[in-house]
Amino acid sequence: SPESIHKFIDKIGYTTYDALNEFALLESAVREDLNDRATRVSAVLNPVKLIITNYPEGQVEEMEAVNNPEHPEEGNHVIEFSRELWMERDDFMEDAPKKYFRMTPGQEVRLKNAYIVKCTGCKKNDAGEITEVYCEYDPDTKSGLPGANRKVKGTIHWVSCAHCLEAEVRLYDRLWKVENPRDELAAIREAKNCDALTAMKEMINPDSLNVLPCCYIEKYAAGMQPLSYLQFQRIGYFNVDKDSTPEKMVFNRTVGLKDVWGKINK
C-alpha cells in the first residue's frame, strides 16, 4: 500500500546520499501497515482433504470469523463448516516429533473458529502419498461454548470443500538471492569476465515467483474488489489481482507473515 511505503521512508529517514537499506525493513513496514488494514480470510494453498468421521453427513454450520481483530468495528463474516474440509498438507504429519502441535494421529488440534478435533489416521494412494486425513470432533468445543476453553496447543485453518472457491495464488518473493545486487554484480563480472546481463542472471532468485493453480479460499473472498488487502491466516498478506474473475480468482502475495529470508541467512 502507499501507506506502507511512507512507513518505510519514516523508518530509514531522509538522506541526500546513496544509501543501502535492508530489504527486511521494507517488509517490516509492509507487515505493520497491512496488519492494520487487511481483512482476515482462510485459504488453503497446498490442500489435502480432512474428513470428520463422526460429523453428520449433509450437515452445514455457519461459523463466525472476525474480519479484522485490529478493528472490531469492522464486524464478522460467516464461514461454512461441514464434514469434509480442505486443510494444509503441511499441517499434517503421520510420524510427528514430540513438539509437533498440528495434526497427527492421536493428537488434538483446534480448527479455527470451529471445533477441537482429534486425528485418527490417514489414507494413502499406491505411491504412498497422503490423500485423506481423518479425525473426530468434540461437539462441546464449538467456538463460543464453555468447552472451547479446553487447552489445545495447536490451531489450524481450513475451508469447507463444498463451500469454497478455487483460486490461483501467485507467491512473489525477492527478485535477487543476494542482499547487495549492485556490489555482487560487479564482483561476478570481474570474476567471470562476463557482461552485466549474464551476471544478473546468476543473482536471480529461482523462487521469486511460484504459481499455485489449484488453491481454495472461503466464499467470502468472492466479493473482494481488485487490489483489496487480505491476510490469508497463518500464511501472509495478499491482494486480489486484476486478472481475477468470478469463475477463477487470482491472488498475489505481498509479503509473508514472517521474515523467512532472515532465518535462512542466519
Stretch-by-stretch model annotation:
Residues S1-K266:
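Polyanion-binding catalytic cores of nucleic-acid enzymes and NTP/SAM-utilizing transferases
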